Amino acid sequence: PTYLSIVATIQDIDLNSKSTRFDEPVGIAFANNAKAYVALSSTNRIAVVDVASRKVVSHLEILAQEPRAIEVRGGRLYVIPFESNNQTQLSGGKPEDLDGKLVTFDARKLASSFDSVGFTVDVVKQPKIPDKDLFIFDTQTDKLVSTVDTLGASLFGLTVDASGNIYVANTDARNHVNGKAGTEKHGLKELDNRPYLNRVSKVSAAGGVDFFQLNPLPPRQPNRQEAVATPFAVKASRDGDVLFLTGAGSDVLLALSAKTGEVVAKAKVGSVPRGVALEEDASGKPIRAWVMNAVSNSVSKVAIAGNSALQLEQTIELHDPTPPVYKEGRMAFNTARSSSNGTFSCASCHADGHTDHLLWVLDTPHLVG
């Protein structure tokens, strides 16, 4: 079969102002030969594009931060926001709502104060905060069909198998685990040096949600050499038995059981792998994976045997004018090798050099003006 594909989406430049138009197209999927969808990350919208005229004919509003990964399957458009949240906030509220748990201080008084000295401030999970992580649209009507909540905090990759099961590669922040800095004097110790869980969230065709943890859950620590950090790109085999997943912080390609989440094979690839595509034989069995390594600017050609065993065949270096010292810095920023347990990197909190927009208790020195 022939598949429509795209090499890249490119940010438009206003030639008069010499600036970008600030819609940041980062993902594309085709409903059919006549209609395409483009994720506009910075504007929290999906552009609906008429292929024949190459014009944007409408937009789908995404009520979440930075929609990036999108996929069309079975008459449905699936969208996940890159910078989701995990319902955490400061434990402030109205005086009449003080309960010592979700509300521990008067937010109005803190707002007029220089700093938080004298206030009992925690980071808490507030269940009333919206946390929509998956948006599903009908590709004929472009109407929103359903949403799914609380799949993760930073959502990177998305795949849908032939049976309608949805898999989201993500990290889930644990900033609430040591969040009781005010009421219980929490600090970094309570975090167990595990700020994030690296996982794949599965939404079954029937709507059930399961989480495939790629490392042992705290307080257990993984073998540093076997740990997986920053699951990014994910692709399901045609038969739905195997997931092929990149670990962007670990420079690996993984094969996972789609039923249990067990890692059944692993291959070392280039620096910061963020894309994967499968090559299949006539029967639909995957025979090769092509992995895009974002920071080393290379493509890894990985042989697949028996639907899961992985063997690196070749690394194809692409032309890259980036100064070597810049690339080395980006590698250091994105790799989890500097962490004691191999589960997080600088980029875990600061993906693409930005922030995760979450509150953390980090035992940093108090600042005095």
Describe each model-derived feature in a short phrase:
Residues Y3-T20, E83, V103-D115, I129, ...:
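Surface-exposed loop and turn segments in beta-propeller and other repeat-based domains
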Residues S17-N32, L63-R73, D131, G152-D161, ...:
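Beta-rich, blade/repeat-based domains predominating
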Residues T2-Y3, D50-R54, D138-D142, S204-G207, ...:
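Short loop/turn segments that connect beta-strands within beta-propeller blades
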Residues N33-A34, G74-G75, S163-G164, D239-D241, ...:
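Short coil/turn segments that connect the beta-strands within blades of beta-propeller domains
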Residues F82-K128, A169-N198:
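Short, conserved, GDST-rich strand-edge loop motifs in beta-rich repeat architectures
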Residues S42, E83-S84, D172-R174, G249, ...:
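Residue-level signature of beta-propeller blades and closely related beta-rich strand-turn architectures
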Residues V38, V79-I80, V168-A169, L245, ...:
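Residue position within the beta-strands of beta-propeller blades
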Residues N341-G353:
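The canonical Cys-X-X-Cys-His
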